[in-house]
Amino acid sequence: TTYRKYPVHFLAFDHKVKDATFSICPQKEGRLWIGTASLMPDDHIDGFRADVLALLRGLKAPVYRWPGGNFVSGYDWHDGIGERDKRPPRRNPAWTGVESNDVGIHEFMRLCELLDTEPYIAVNAGLGGVKEAADEVEYCNGAEDTPMGKWRKQNGQAKPWKVKWWSVGNEMFGDWQLGFMSTEAFVKKHNSFADAMWKV
């Protein structure tokens, strides 16, 4: 089965309705396989709501961190790369629900550009490994001829972003965190991550 994208524009007649239902119904007998349905307002900016961007601009925050909180300890950054419609949805291991992976590195970097703010990226030091972290740095900051830089270019971004702010993990001292470990163990893990990331 080959999935296809079908963009549709429609107008909601009554904007005051609180409990509306959106349905996709075939006109003939048969079977529909729907990967996902995404609804965005017409005035969205690269997938972000214009009103939310306006509010964020008003904050004038100098730095934005992503991915945030406990979520990062189970997040695989590879899942947020490539065409949005082909990204795998994943069960969110830190919280309930499903992560659609609509926002990955490229979208986060675009958000920072739109807000004129510095990106700050957290790497997965919970269930993630050293190589994944170093590869993520290379994907963001590596030259076009590096393995990750080539992949970044294939995904539409030739020039490296030169991300300056990075962190290793999130609250690894807490037993609520995926991959929780003792302070002594995390110091060793942190340093091995940092060494590999600095070498990129």
Task: Label the model's feature ranges.
Residues 1-200:
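Non-catalytic accessory regions flanking glycosidase/transglycosidase catalytic cores in CAZymes
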